[in-house]
């Protein structure tokens, strides 16, 4: 049957990890407290604030304390939905104000155009929210790439280290697991995707990166589906 869809990780795969860690994360930490104070009556922000209180078991935490918790979670790279939702809202503000452009590796930009021309479907799966992924790809340093994607998945689909998340993706896009290629730089994510039956491939952008028993590529140009 062959590959009919490609699911790509973002940080470290389509996007320089340094952009996430040195630009996006610090920006969200810097403005978090002010953002919460300004938007605390927005229903979505208010819901996220309540979710943070519940997860942290601090139901009486005021806005400043909630901001402290969130900044700590950013430092710990916690993959919790309220944090990722709030970061997406904050980054939307940053992109709109031209604080930064989304970094996308040039080889992926060329590749995704080729994949779509070949009739392949392309999806992204990230611990960042779907909205944050759309922002990244719509405000990239090479323009708006969102029309080239068939969809995006985030923590609402499941934890990226959990087999069930990939099974959920398989069910959502209505293909068999062996018709889907998952590309990531993280060995544990590849292991979970493989357990769900997907074909896997590891992106190795850095020589010091930990590798596993998977096919290794250093660029999307090395993937050919003709």
From Swiss-Prot:
Catalytic reaction list: 5-methylsulfanyl-2,3-dioxopentyl phosphate + H2O = 1,2-dihydroxy-5-(methylsulfanyl)pent-1-en-3-one + phosphate
EC main group: hydrolase
GO terms for MF: 2,3-diketo-5-methylthiopentyl-1-phosphate enolase activity; 2-hydroxy-3-keto-5-methylthiopentenyl-1-phosphate phosphatase activity; acireductone synthase activity; magnesium ion binding
Family membership: Belongs to the HAD-like hydrolase superfamily. MasA/MtnC family.
Keyword annotations from UniProtKB, A to Z: Amino-acid biosynthesis, Hydrolase, Magnesium, Metal-binding, Methionine biosynthesis
Domain of life (superkingdom): Bacteria
Organism: Shewanella amazonensis (strain ATCC BAA-1098 / SB2B)
EC number in record: 3.1.3.77
Pfam families cross-referenced by the UniProt entry: Hydrolase (PF00702)
Biological-process GO terms, alphabetical: L-methionine salvage from methylthioadenosine
Pathway it works in: Amino-acid biosynthesis; L-methionine biosynthesis via salvage pathway; L-methionine from S-methyl-5-thio-alpha-D-ribose 1-phosphate: step 3/6; Amino-acid biosynthesis; L-methionine biosynthesis via salvage pathway; L-methionine from S-methyl-5-thio-alpha-D-ribose 1-phosphate: step 4/6
Named cofactor requirement(s): Mg(2+)
Annotated protein name in UniProt: Enolase-phosphatase E1
Co-factor binding details: Binds 1 Mg(2+) ion per subunit.
Keyword rRNA processing attached: no
Claim: Phosphoprotein is one of the keywords in the record: no
Family matches, as InterPro entries: Enolase-ppase_E1 (IPR023943), HAD-like_sf (IPR036412), HAD-SF_hydro_IA (IPR006439), HAD_sf (IPR023214)
Subunit-structure text: Monomer.
Function: Bifunctional enzyme that catalyzes the enolization of 2,3-diketo-5-methylthiopentyl-1-phosphate (DK-MTP-1-P) into the intermediate 2-hydroxy-3-keto-5-methylthiopentenyl-1-phosphate (HK-MTPenyl-1-P), which is then dephosphorylated to form the acireductone 1,2-dihydroxy-3-keto-5-methylthiopentene (DHK-MTPene).
């Amino acid at each position: 049957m062959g590959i009919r869809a490609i699911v790509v990780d973002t940080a470290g795969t389509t996007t320089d990890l340094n952009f996430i860690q040195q630009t996006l994360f610090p920006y969200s930490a810097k403005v978090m407290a002010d953002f919460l104070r300004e938007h605390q009556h927005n229903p979505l922000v208010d819901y996220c604030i309540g979710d943070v209180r519940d997860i942290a078991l601090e139901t009486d935490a005021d806005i400043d304390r909630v901001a402290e918790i969130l900044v700590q979670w950013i430092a710990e790279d916690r993959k919790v939905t309220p944090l990722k939702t709030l970061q997406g809202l904050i980054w939307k503000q940053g992109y709109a104000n031209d604080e930064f452009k989304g970094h996308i590796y040039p080889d992926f930009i060329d590749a995704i155009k080729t994949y779509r021309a070949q009739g392949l479907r392309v999806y992204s799966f990230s611990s960042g929210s779907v909205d944050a992924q759309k922002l990244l790809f719509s405000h990239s340093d090479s323009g708006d790439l969102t029309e080239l994607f068939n969809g995006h998945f985030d923590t609402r689909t499941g934890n990226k280290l959990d087999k069930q998340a990939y099974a959920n993706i398989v069910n959502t896009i209505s293909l068999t697991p062996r018709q889907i290629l998952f590309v990531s730089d993280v060995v544990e994510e590849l292991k979970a995707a493989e357990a769900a039956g997907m074909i896997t491939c590891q992106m190795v952008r850095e020589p010091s990166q930990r590798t596993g028993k998977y096919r290794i590529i250093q660029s999307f140009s090395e993937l050919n589906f003709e």
